[in-house]
Amino acid sequence: MNEELSTFFYVPVGTMMLAIAFPAILLPTPNRLITNRWITIQQWLIQLIMKQLLSIHNTKGLSWSLMLITLTLFIGLTNLLGLLPYSFAPTTQLTVNLSMAIPLWTGTVVPGFRYKTKISLAHLLPQGTPMFLIPMIIIIETISLLIRPVTLAVRLTANITAGHSLIHLTGTATLTLSSIHSMTITVTFVTVILLTILELAVALIQAYVFALLISLYLHENA
């Protein structure tokens, strides 16, 4: 039982350090007037992320651009590294995702309540709410606001864990059925390949969704 608990709270620091170091290795900064294809792809990717995440923000919100781009690259690379054989995805640990979600959510909400108190409080009561529903709506909206970091972390954890578990179960079935019939192993092997491709897409999409929701929370309170 103690080993199970320690495994649940175990944080694979090595994978996270690789995810932090990979952008510096794979995405070099341009130091010459004529750039190569790799640097062009790098610049296009960063511009695409900035366009998707920051198009709704004002000048104050744009100060978060470096944070949001770094967050997207970090989560995306961490998810991709977790798909390597004999590796482990830190984003399958709820504690890791909560350690990212709670500070980022706090950083978007606290400035809103500090500098735009009336506007932030107005979000707790939608316009046109009937009088008899006001107390209930305020409670519901407050709970909805407070559980946002939890839903952020749980969404990322659930999606990454589900994908890895599905690949593991299908791979185990492939090995088990390999001695039965050649056609069966072919079908299951193709299924594993397709699931792996799907999980590669999910790894990048979940990184984008996590950063996008933080961006929307920031826009709501900026």
From Swiss-Prot:
Topology relative to the membrane: Multi-pass membrane protein
Molecular-function annotations in GO: proton channel activity; proton-transporting ATP synthase activity, rotational mechanism
Keywords, in A-Z order: ATP synthesis, CF(0), Hydrogen ion transport, Ion transport, Membrane, Mitochondrion, Mitochondrion inner membrane, Transmembrane, Transmembrane helix, Transport
Main location: mitochondrion
Gene Ontology biological-process annotations: proton motive force-driven ATP synthesis; proton motive force-driven mitochondrial ATP synthesis; proton transmembrane transport
Subcellular location: Mitochondrion inner membrane
Assembly: Component of the ATP synthase complex composed at least of ATP5F1A/subunit alpha, ATP5F1B/subunit beta, ATP5MC1/subunit c (homooctomer), MT-ATP6/subunit a, MT-ATP8/subunit 8, ATP5ME/subunit e, ATP5MF/subunit f, ATP5MG/subunit g, ATP5MK/subunit k, ATP5MJ/subunit j, ATP5F1C/subunit gamma, ATP5F1D/subunit delta, ATP5F1E/subunit epsilon, ATP5PF/subunit F6, ATP5PB/subunit b, ATP5PD/subunit d, ATP5PO/subunit OSCP.
Function: Subunit a, of the mitochondrial membrane ATP synthase complex (F(1)F(0) ATP synthase or Complex V) that produces ATP from ADP in the presence of a proton gradient across the membrane which is generated by electron transport complexes of the respiratory chain. ATP synthase complex consist of a soluble F(1) head domain - the catalytic core - and a membrane F(1) domain - the membrane proton channel. These two domains are linked by a central stalk rotating inside the F(1) region and a stationary peripheral stalk.
Name used for this protein in its record: ATP synthase F(0) complex subunit a
Organism: Loxodonta africana (African elephant)
